[in-house]
Amino acid sequence: MDITLTIFAQALAFAGLIWIVATKIWPPLLKAIEERQQKIAEGLAAADRSQKDLAQAQEKVNEALKDARTKANEIIDQAHARANQIIEAAKLEAIAEANRQKDLAQAEIDASATRAREELRRQVSSLAVSGAEKLLKREIDATAHKALLDELAAEI
């Protein structure tokens, strides 16, 4: 065989191989590569969207936590205010009860003092009558009068 014919046959076989590769193998290969590139691009875009969504969700969570803390502080403040109201009401009730007890004690003291005065009046009147009887029974001279007054003073 001639070298020219061999080169020509190899060139023709190579051209046929290129044509087969270009028409049958290359298009599906390019299509697969493009699909893979598109999937990778979609994956990267999805990752970017996910990061943005995550950032937005984090902002929402932070806002919700801030709102929850604010509401919790409001509830705590309301509880403190209610506790202070209860304490003030208890103080006022205790003061009122103390005043009522004081008034009852004062009334009892006044009643006891009145009873004691009445008892003293009865005793004084009894002593006065007794002293008058003794004076009328005796002859009155200065020494007897003084002794009688001393005796009455001792009884009082």
Swiss-Prot record:
A molecular function GO annotation: proton-transporting ATP synthase activity, rotational mechanism
GO cellular component terms attached to this protein's record: plasma membrane; proton-transporting ATP synthase complex
Annotated HAMAP family: ATP_synth_b_bprime (MF_01398)
Gene that encodes it: atpF
Chief place of localization: membrane
PANTHER family documented for this protein: ATP SYNTHASE SUBUNIT B, ATP SYNTHASE SUBUNIT B', CHLOROPLASTIC
The keyword Cell membrane is annotated on this UniProt entry: yes
Membrane-spanning parts: 3-23
Ranges in coiled-coil conformation: none
Designated name of the protein: ATP synthase subunit b
Subunit structure: F-type ATPases have 2 components, F(1) - the catalytic core - and F(0) - the membrane proton channel. F(1) has five subunits: alpha(3), beta(3), gamma(1), delta(1), epsilon(1). F(0) has three main subunits: a(1), b(2) and c(10-14). The alpha and beta chains form an alternating ring which encloses part of the gamma chain. F(1) is attached to F(0) by a central stalk formed by the gamma and epsilon chains, while a peripheral stalk is formed by the delta and b chains.
Lineage: superkingdom: Bacteria
Family note: Belongs to the ATPase B chain family.
Keyword Transmembrane: yes
Cited Pfam families: ATP-synt_B (PF00430)
Its biological purpose: F(1)F(0) ATP synthase produces ATP from ADP in the presence of a proton or sodium gradient. F-type ATPases consist of two structural domains, F(1) containing the extramembraneous catalytic core and F(0) containing the membrane proton channel, linked together by a central stalk and a peripheral stalk. During catalysis, ATP synthesis in the catalytic domain of F(1) is coupled via a rotary mechanism of the central stalk subunits to proton translocation.
Topology within the bilayer: Single-pass membrane protein
